[in-house]
């Protein structure tokens, strides 16, 4: 995978280790779901059990088109090609990859980034392609769907991992995100599912348990005072 603005490429394995411990040992689990799948920084580290269902959703239609098509990018594109793709909304799958891959700080179509060293850029590109190919080999039947998290409101006996836009942060989202509504949804879903949520902090009135935390450097923020945060994984109880 390539990076994703606010994504979990660097710490995905740590989060997946917590989830896998439950996934591997609870025979009542019927499936695994990520309503904010992004570039699958956590998902790619989740264990594959052939007898359960794997779901992934995101509000970005280009991104879902890219994953659903199972297309594999073959070339590094130039700035003019990138700009042309930005204005061509018909090329959804390509936009779903290059928009983030070449976007500055991996924010979709934000500026243009390509490493000035040709060999290092080639290595960066091939590394992303290898991760994409590995994901499709590992999860050949994963089901991708465009929409917000509420499309999964009917799930029962699933593990649901959510990486929403963080409250009071500058993470990109296609529309204003209602954190309070999301928190209520998580509480409701936890009655019949196992729900995990990534965040820096949550409101004091939520009785959620921290099951993992790690100090990280925040590469998405523009305020130097916000560059170091503690990433936390909560179990919704």
Question: Whereabouts are the PLM-identified features?
Answer:
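S-adenosyl-L-methionine
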Residues: 1-44, 49
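Glycine-rich phosphate-binding "P-loop"
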Residues: 1-4, 168-176
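Short amphipathic alpha-helix with an adjacent loop that forms part of the alpha/beta core around
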Residues: 20-24, 151-157
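Conserved proline-anchored active-site loop of SAM-dependent methyltransferases
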Residues: 32-46, 56-61, 101-104, 146-149, ...
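Short, polar loop motifs at secondary-structure junctions
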Residues: 37-41, 130-131, 198-203
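Active-site regions of enzymes building and remodeling cell-envelope glycoconjugates
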Residues: 51-55, 72-73, 157-160, 205-219
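Class I S-adenosyl-L-methionine-dependent methyltransferase module
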Residues: 52-146, 150
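Long, positively charged, glycine-interspersed low-complexity recognition regions
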Residues: 174-237
């Amino acid at each position: 995978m390539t990076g994703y603005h606010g994504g979990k490429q660097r710490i995905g394995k740590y989060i997946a280790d917590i989830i896998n411990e439950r996934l591997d040992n609870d025979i009542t689990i019927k499936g695994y779901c990520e309503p904010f799948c992004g570039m699958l920084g956590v998902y790619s580290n989740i264990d594959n059990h052939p007898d359960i269902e794997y779901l992934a959703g995101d509000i970005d239609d280009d991104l879902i088109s890219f994953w659903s098509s199972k297309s594999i990018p073959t070339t590094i594109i130039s700035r003019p090609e990138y700009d042309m793709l930005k204005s061509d909304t018909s090329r959804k799958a390509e936009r779903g990859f290059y928009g983030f891959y070449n976007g500055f700080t991996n924010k979709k179509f934000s500026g243009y980034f390509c490493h000035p060293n040709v060999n290092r850029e080639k290595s960066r590109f091939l590394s992303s392609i290898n991760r994409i190919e590995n994901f499709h080999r590992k999860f050949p039947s994963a089901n991708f769907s465009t929409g917000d998290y509420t499309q999964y409101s009917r799930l029962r006996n699933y593990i649901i991992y959510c990486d929403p836009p963080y409250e009071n942060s500058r993470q990109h989202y296609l529309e204003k995100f209602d954190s309070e509504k999301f928190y209520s949804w998580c509480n409701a879903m936890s009655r019949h599912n196992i729900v995990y949520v990534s965040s820096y902090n949550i409101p004091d009135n939520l009785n959620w348990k921290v099951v993992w935390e790690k100090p990280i450097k925040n590469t998405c923020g523009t305020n130097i005072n916000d560059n170091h945060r503690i990433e936390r994984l909560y179990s919704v109880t």
